C-alpha cells in the first residue's frame, strides 16, 4: 500500500517538490501517548526529574506537549502549510488518522500544486526528488 502516515508527513513537508503517487494516502493525526508508554516514562524518569507524584509528572507532560506542538506547528507553517489545515489535523481523537484528499492537500500546500502526481517509474534523480510512498 502506498502511504505516508504520521511522522512521514513531516518529512513530506520538508521537501521542496512535495509530490505523491496517484492513489497514495497521506495520513495525519494529533500527537498522543499510550497509557503504557506514559507509565513507563514516569517510572523510568521520576527520580531524575524529581516528580513526587503523578500530578507533578502531569504538569511536566502538559508543558512538554504544548512545547512540542508549538515546535511542530512552527515548522509546518515555515514550510508554507496552511494554518487551518493544521488545525483540522489536530481535531481528530487520539489514534484516529485523517486522510485528506489530493485537492485538500494541494490547497493546504502540503503537496506542491501542479506537481501533485509522481509517475510510476521515477525518472527525476534531482536532489529535490519527492518522497516515494511505498
Place the predicted regions along the sequence by residue.
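Charged, glycine-interspersed solvent-exposed loop segments at helix/strand-loop junctions
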Residues: 36-131
Amino acid at each position: 500500500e502506498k502511504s505516508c502516515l504520521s511522522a512521514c508527513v513531516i518529512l513530506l513537508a520538508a521537501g521542496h517538490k512535495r509530490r505523491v503517487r496517484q492513489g497514495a494516502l497521506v495520513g495525519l493525526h494529533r500527537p498522543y501517548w499510550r497509557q503504557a508508554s506514559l507509565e513507563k516514562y514516569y517510572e523510568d524518569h521520576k527520580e531524575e526529574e524529581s516528580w513526587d507524584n503523578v500530578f507533578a509528572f502531569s504538569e511536566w507532560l502538559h508543558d512538554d506537549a504544548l512545547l512540542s506542538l508549538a515546535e511542530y506547528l512552527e515548522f509546518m507553517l515555515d514550510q508554507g502549510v496552511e494554518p487551518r489545515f493544521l488545525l483540522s489535523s489536530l481535531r481528530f481523537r487520539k489514534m484516529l488518522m485523517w486522510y485528506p484528499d489530493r485537492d485538500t492537500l494541494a490547497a493546504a500546500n502540503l503537496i506542491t500544486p501542479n506537481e501533485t502526481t509522481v509517475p510510476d517509474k521515477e525518472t527525476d534523480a534531482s536532489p529535490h526528488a519527492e518522497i516515494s510512498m511505498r
